[in-house]
Amino acid sequence: MKNFKNFTLEDMKAKRLELKKEYLDLRFKSVVGHVENPLKKREIRRDIARLNTMICEYELGIRKV
């Protein structure tokens, strides 16, 4: 799971917000014009999903902080 294992819950939430903003920017750029790395959208989307899973695990008590 990439390098998110050592993040605290607050760090994960902040990183998720940052990635969501970056993903939104890439979506706009792809609609309006040229994107340098089109696969970056997929990577960011998957990272957001990983973070969502880990945050949910912390909230359910499956994963300990």
Swiss-Prot record:
- One Gene Ontology cellular component: ribosome
Name the source's superkingdom.
Bacteria
| One Pfam family it belongs to | Ribosomal_L29
Give one GO molecular function term: structural constituent of ribosome
Q: Where is the signal peptide?
A: none
Keywords assigned: Ribonucleoprotein, Ribosomal protein
* Keyword Ribosomal protein belongs to the record: yes
GO BP terms in the entry: translation
Question: What Gene3D superfamilies does the record tag this protein with?
Answer: 1.10.287.310
HAMAP family for this protein? Ribosomal_uL29
Its family remark reads:
Belongs to the universal ribosomal protein uL29 family.
Please name the NCBIfam families in this protein's record.
L29
The molecule here is called Large ribosomal subunit protein uL29
Q: Which organism is it from?
A: Borreliella burgdorferi (strain ATCC 35210 / DSM 4680 / CIP 102532 / B31)
User: What does the record give as the organism's lineage?
Assistant: Bacteria, Pseudomonadati, Spirochaetota, Spirochaetia, Spirochaetales
